């Protein structure tokens, strides 16, 4: 009796696991579809547009039902080049391809894209496999902000300008470099108040993955590509001679343009490759995290939670593990 009572008491006091509060519902994928999800955008009617690394976009319905096994996949677009971002905006779906910001829409109402326009194809690429492009997000200037990955390894067609940058693109397709020093900026998102934040992956010149706000003229720490800042398109101060082997706060004293991160993600304890993010705007419907930020991680197949605050004009915050156990990396 004593043993039974003790065990019952322990069962009542042990905290429940995260899976008891936030379930993961796996949507079955038709056998004929190779998904390799690279971007997701939820439309006003609840339909999910799902892009794939291979260049397809599917519209997925039925994902909000209690039983997601009835979800339907329909091909919306195909033939894109590595689309890594979708944004529904003013009747169009904007898509970030490897070297081009495009927009597309379905004008016939049959669920298939029938109109595709190039907004800007000025983003240089050298042919390196790692020259990904992410976004777009609407910036405080009303333009589309996109981020460009630096290359890793050979550059078959020579060094390309504006790699490791944030680019602001207006409706006319004009592109203006806005921030430098990015490494592998896999997530870019507009905040509810209009600023744009991005996530960067750990590696050389970036000791741990991070979350940072982006402001025009910022330098984010990686020296690759800063030679592009000597071109006339760069209208801010030029950063040169980035010191090696010093902590970020020390470098900030030497390079005032350096943007200190709002949050560092502890290596391995909080993944290694943060990517896409979303603010909780449900006003409590998703739990006690209203206004906080959720960040996915590609390496760790997880979702992290971030609480931010602004102190004396600077953003800082804390990060927490939120949900493990995804079946693949999330981007």
PLM regions with names:
Residues 12-331:
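Beta-propeller domains with acidic blade repeats across secreted/periplasmic ectodomains
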């Amino acid at each position: 009796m004593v043993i039974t009572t003790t065990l019952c008491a322990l069962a009542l006091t042990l905290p429940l696991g995260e899976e008891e509060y936030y379930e993961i519902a796996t949507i079955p994928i038709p056998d004929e579809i190779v998904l390799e999800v690279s971007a997701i955008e939820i439309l006003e009617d609840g339909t999910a547009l799902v892009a794939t690394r291979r260049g397809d976009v599917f519209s997925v319905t039925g994902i909000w039902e209690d039983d997601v096994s009835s979800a339907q996949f329909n091909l919306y677009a195909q033939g894109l080049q590595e689309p890594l971002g979708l944004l529904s905006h003013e009747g169009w779906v904007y898509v970030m391809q490897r070297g081009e910001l495009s927009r597309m829409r379905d004008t016939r109402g049959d669920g298939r894209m029938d109109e595709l326009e190039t907004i800007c194809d000025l983003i240089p690429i050298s042919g390196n496999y790692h020259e990904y492009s992410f976004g777009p997000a609407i910036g405080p200037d009303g333009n589309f902000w996109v981020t460009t990955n630096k290359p890793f390894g050979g550059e078959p067609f020579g060094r390309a300008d504006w790699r490791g940058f944030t680019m602001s693109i207006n409706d006319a397709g004009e592109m203006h470099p806005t921030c430098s020093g990015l490494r592998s900026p896999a997530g870019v998102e507009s905040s509810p108040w209009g600023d744009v934040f991005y996530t960067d992956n750990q590696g050389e010149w970036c000791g741990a993955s991070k979350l940072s706000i982006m402001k025009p003229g910022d330098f984010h720490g990686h020296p690759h590509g800063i030679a592009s800042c000597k071109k006339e398109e760069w209208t801010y101060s030029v950063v040169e001679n980035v010191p090696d082997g010093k902590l970020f706060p020390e470098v900030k004293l030497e390079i005032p343009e350096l943007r200190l991160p709002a949050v560092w993600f502890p290596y391995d304890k909080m993944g290694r490759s943060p990517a896409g993010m979303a603010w909780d705007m449900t006003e409590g419907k998703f739990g006690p995290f209203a206004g906080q930020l959720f960040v996915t991680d590609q390496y760790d197949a997880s979702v992290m939670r971030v609480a931010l605050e602004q102190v004396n004009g600077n953003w800082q915050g804390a990060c927490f593990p939120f949900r493990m156990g995804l079946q693949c990396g999330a981007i």
